[in-house]
Amino acid sequence: MSEIIQDLSLEDVIGDRFGRYSKYIIQERALPDVRDGLKPVQRRILFAMYSSGNTYDKNFRKSAKTVGDVIGQYHPHGDSSVYDAMVRLSQDWKLRHVLIEMHGNNGSIDNDPPAAMRYTEAKLSQLSEELLRDINKETVSFIPNYDDTTLEPMVLPARFPNLLINGSTGISSGYATDIPPHNLAEVIQGTLKYIDQPDITINQLMKYIKGPDFPTGGIIQGIEGIKKAYETGKGKVVVRSRVDEEPLRSGRKQLIVTEIPYEVNKSSLVKRIDELRADKKVDGIVEVRDETDRTGLRIAIELKKDANSESIKNYLYKNSDLQISYNFNMVAISEGRPKLMGLREIIESYLNHQIEVVTNRTRYDLEQAEKRMHIVEGLMKALSILDEVIALIRNSKNKKDAKDNLVAEYDFTEAQAEAIVMLQLYRLTNTDIEALKKEHEELEALIKELRNILDNHEALLAVIKDELNEIKKKFKVDRLSTIEAEISEIKIDKEVMVPSEEVILSLTQHGYIKRTSTRSFNASGVTEIGLKDGDRLLKHESVNTQDTVLVFTNKGRYLFIPVHKLADIRWKELGQHISQIVPIDEDEEVVNVYNEKDFKNEAFYIMATKNGMIKKSSASQFKTTRFNKPLINMKVKDKDELINVVRLESDQLITVLTHKGMSLTYSTNELSDTGLRAAGVKSINLKDEDYVVMTEDVNDSDSIIMVTQRGAMKRIDFNVLQEAKRAQRGITLLKELKKKPHRIVAGAVVKENHTKYIVFSQHHEEYGNIDDVHLSEQYTNGSFIIDTDDFGEVESMILE
């Protein structure tokens, strides 16, 4: 035979083959049929068990036998895939109503593997037989199996809407399905209402089918998500564990979880909660125990004595599978194609299937009844001429001759003649004659009823309704899942996530930051802080791990850093550079740092630039959830930079000090609260080539200390300052010299807690007591404290 060779491109061949493969996967493996809610392997398992008599009213049989039957006759795939599907049909935490009963280890909600199929035994559940009922009455179409040795059903009769009741999940090429299980009684009631009112709306249907009913129970939140899913096939709800509070003898409390979301692995959930406890991501949990036994699921979360149980519960909802989002994606095979279907479409498809099934069954029953009627009429006729019939049979040569004689002599049909010659003598009693008459009457009534069903659509629907009601009455169970209309907002107190602890925060001039335990700080002392050469401590203060640090830079940006996210480093060790926490520019410098507890509206920040701009922004504006990048707090122009930030609880005086010795004092109530991206307004009217060196808050108990580039230090009393209006030039605080004039390089407001100063020159650090610096008059240049000829010009100063 000559070969046929086709010249095809690889792209076409691959595309064609993958298309065929995808079609097979979609239709024959991963997606359920909308009519019976089963995937092919599930259908084959149930049919194989039914065909072999492995039904609910019989003894259990080895699972391996069923797997062998399925593989040998219907499903030529690996035994593990068949056994896995069989096991799932028996798991009451996966299916709302199991379709297979299994003895032995059939896995667990912890995702433990089942015992090998040679150890477990199984049989059909009572409900699954309602899927297969009347399958032998030509109710559904059969097709040849994979090797044409037998037939298998394309779909099961399915006397109840299994797709909705048990749901389905699967992934195929380009398609996925997630249909949740529902309550049997609700689904059947909704179907009955649809039969009575085909134009019923989703809102009306949801009075009966309220929403999913998961086998693991739980609380379903989001009625709008359910409605959207029922309308479109896609929707989203929140599924939350059922958690109750239980007192302990010790005075402590524990949270008891008795129901978890559908498809959640219990052991993984327990492990996750315990990891959150061990990693100190949540404060207040003492112990997590899995106390599940044969009486039911139970997870105990023991809490500390004063723990906020509600906040801990909310934290676990958000950070573990104690609460999940369930996404409806109701895709099923309808008329041979995958289709996204809403609730009405699914019910309509099921009802159309039932109409076809009941019609086929009725035709079959009618045909059988008419055949039996024909036989009964023949027997009755024979009994009416019994003597003649007996004589004819006795005179016949054999069975065939007797049948032929009956047909020829008395006009019996072939079927009637067969029944007559097979009639046993004891059936000729008067009792059996009466029984035939009674059977004839019953058959007449049955045939009339069956013909009425076929001729009358309303009668056919009535049959479907009666059968659905029968199943509802027989298998009705209470709802397990509770439905709540709204999705609860999860509010988590910071105290739950972060243990409250007082620590020492430190920040250096070069941007090294750390938090240190009070024990390490007290053991070392301030002066023993770990620093790089040339670096110095900018600020240190006691803060709480539940606080937030705002680090301000010279580029008008700030870093939002929760204290608990800072590395816990010993006082004597070098801190972590700020750029390792939040990336900043190489030329970006830290100008100040503040600790925020609650970002309350009354507090505000004053931000001042070198070129004399100033702004005021409420503390609440600085709160954010973004920690990974610097955020803008002031729009700073080119060749300008932020020099200081001051946090105030209420309006008060601020003093501005310039390089050329000018000072302006005014109230912050002259500044309006502006957004973080604003550039601000003019603070002081600067002279040419002058710039701001200090902007700080001041009150009548303070003094001002300043140092010039020539090494002179001057301290003035608050009374020297004169309150004025913003944007003025201010007063002069230095005596102007024609030769080598003094220029202020640093200034600070002396508060009650300040006792020492440190002045930094190019080659020297000068330490001194503030009390040793006497108050000066307005128009003086102060006293020299550093010989700049020896140590270079002064650059900066800090107070401690």
Swiss-Prot record:
Domain of life per record: Bacteria
Gene Ontology molecular-function annotations: ATP binding; DNA binding; DNA negative supercoiling activity
InterPro entries xrefs: GyrA/parC_rep (IPR006691), Gyrase/topoIV_suA_C (IPR035516), Topo_IIA-like_dom_sf (IPR013760), Topo_IIA_A/C_ab (IPR013758), Topo_IIA_A_a_sf (IPR013757), Topo_IIA_dom_A (IPR002205), TopoIV_A_Gpos (IPR005741), Type_II_DNA_Topoisomerases (IPR050220)
Organism: Staphylococcus epidermidis (strain ATCC 35984 / DSM 28319 / BCRC 17069 / CCUG 31568 / BM 3577 / RP62A)
Pfam families in alphabetical order: DNA_gyraseA_C (PF03989), DNA_topoisoIV (PF00521)
Protein name according to UniProt: DNA topoisomerase 4 subunit A
Sorted UniProt keywords: Cell membrane, DNA-binding, Isomerase, Membrane, Topoisomerase
Catalytic activity: ATP-dependent breakage, passage and rejoining of double-stranded DNA
Transport in keyword set: no
